[in-house]
Amino acid sequence: MGVEGCTKCIKYLLFVFNFVFWLAGGVILGVALWLRHDPQTTNLLYLELGDKPAPNTFYVGIYILIAVGAVMMFVGFLGCYGAIQESQCLLGTFFTCLVILFACEVAAGIWGFVNKDQIAKDVKQFYDQALQQAVVDDDANNAKAVVKTFHETLNCCGSSTLSALTTSMLKNNLCPSGSSIISNLFKEDCHQKIDELFSGKLYLIGIAAIVVAVIMIFEMILSMVLCCGIRNSSVY
């Protein structure tokens, strides 16, 4: 016997929320893949300074995001099917998956909050090491290539950790082509550009996580209400 009245409204409301959840999973998966293959981050995080690769903490978060997006699409489909079929078993499984996903999202949010400054800090340290090697050693071709990639990708020049007045002559050939010594002195600091690059992407991820968390809370409530409604309707 199918559900009636308010429970039937909850059934279709849950279906709509699950469809939105499925779409959100697709959007998160798409955004994560875009962040993974974004030319700016790819150019910088694929670099190597000698035997030392660029910090990959950012990519760890992206891989987690890809997995979350894929799981969300599966769970959203499961919720849609469970709601239409009025299956207590499927709805119970759906609720359990939501609880696990919500716990993982909270854990990922805590990890992201703790590491939000560390990601940019690690990249800036990597850049500073390459810049110091390139300035001190004329034969440090690998370091020069790393520095040039940073400068061309971010359209910046140099770091505040080195004096612009004492190193402008040495940095001139490392800055974007066409830059003069005078313009390089006033070009934006690479540390600031690195902060802007990663803070913008982390802000986007944070907004997406909050929206998904709100949807998940509503879905957990609706799935339990619908499950109870199905159980009560089967009694009568």
Curated annotation (Swiss-Prot):
Signal peptide stretch: none
Compartments, as annotated in UniProt: Cell membrane; Basolateral cell membrane
Entry keyword set: Adaptive immunity, Cell membrane, Disulfide bond, Immunity, Lipid-binding, Membrane, Transmembrane, Transmembrane helix
Molecular functions per Gene Ontology: cholesterol binding; integrin binding
Post-translation changes: Not glycosylated. Likely constitutively palmitoylated at low levels. Protein palmitoylation is up-regulated upon coligation of BCR and CD9-C2R-CD81 complexes in lipid rafts.
Principal location listed in the UniProt entry: membrane
Extracellular topological domain: 34-63, 113-201
Residue positions binding cholesterol: 219
UniProt GO BP: CD4-positive, alpha-beta T cell costimulation; cellular response to low-density lipoprotein particle stimulus; humoral immune response mediated by circulating immunoglobulin; immunological synapse formation; macrophage fusion; myoblast fusion involved in skeletal muscle regeneration; osteoclast fusion; positive regulation of B cell activation
Membrane topology type: Multi-pass membrane protein
Domain of life according to the entry: Eukaryota
Site residues by UniProt (Important for interaction with integrin): 116, 144, 148
A Pfam family it matches: Tetraspanin
Regions of this protein lying in the Cytoplasmic compartment: 1-12, 85-89, 225-236
CC annotations in GO: basolateral plasma membrane; immunological synapse; membrane; plasma membrane; tetraspanin-enriched microdomain
Disulfide bond positions: 156-190, 157-175
TM annotation in the entry: 13-33, 64-84, 90-112, 202-224
Subunit structure: Homodimer. Part of a complex composed of CD19, CR2/CD21, CD81 and IFITM1/CD225 in the membrane of mature B cells. Interacts (via the second extracellular domain) with CD19; this interaction is initiated early during biosynthesis in the ER and enables trafficking of only properly folded CD19. Part of a complex that includes MHC class II/HLA-DR molecules and IFITM1. Interacts with IFITM1. Interacts with IFITM2 and IFITM3. Part of integrin-tetraspanin complex composed of CD9, CD81, beta-1 and beta-2 integrins in the membrane of monocyte/macrophages.
Family listed: Belongs to the tetraspanin (TM4SF) family.
Domain description: Binds cholesterol in a cavity lined by the transmembrane spans.
Function comment: Structural component of specialized membrane microdomains known as tetraspanin-enriched microdomains (TERMs), which act as platforms for receptor clustering and signaling. Essential for trafficking and compartmentalization of CD19 receptor on the surface of activated B cells. Upon initial encounter with microbial pathogens, enables the assembly of CD19-CR2/CD21 and B cell receptor (BCR) complexes at signaling TERMs, lowering the threshold dose of antigen required to trigger B cell clonal expansion and antibody production.
UniProt name for this protein: CD81 protein
Gene: CD81
